[in-house]
Regions:
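Charge-dense, helix-prone N-terminal extensions
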Residues: 1-111
């Protein structure tokens, strides 16, 4: 019986290595997130930030192994920022979804 359990334990370890996610690359994530945000209706890219109707809405910077992102609570000349430190692909996708939802809300309120 011990031999069967050893085989199962070894297989589980090799499966974990096979299915492990690649390490997070903030530079690559920045490129993908910028591409996704360019597709959001109402956002305009300027240098390392995105604007909504000429007002700052999103800023993105790389900080070591993380992507630092700031999202304006409301668009303004000097907005109140919501800061996030993105350290994996899931957090980057969630941030992109949050930006889309917030910009959609701003667009609807502006109409």
């Amino acid at each position: 019986m011990a031999r069967v359990n050893d085989d199962i334990d070894n297989r589980d370890a090799s499966d974990a290595e096979f299915f492990s996610a690649p390490p997070f690359n903030p530079a690559e994530a920045l490129v993908q997130l910028r591409r996704a945000l360019r597709a959001v209706t109402g956002l305009t890219e300027r240098a390392h930030r995105f604007e909504w109707k000429g007002r700052q809405a999103v800023t993105l910077t790389i900080d070591g192994e993380r992507l630092q992102a700031r999202l304006a609570r409301r668009p303004a000349a000097s907005p109140e920022w919501e800061s996030r430190s993105l350290k994996n692909g899931a957090e980057v996708r969630k941030f992109g979804d949050d930006v889309r939802q917030r910009v959609s809300r701003w667009n609807n309120a502006d109409e």
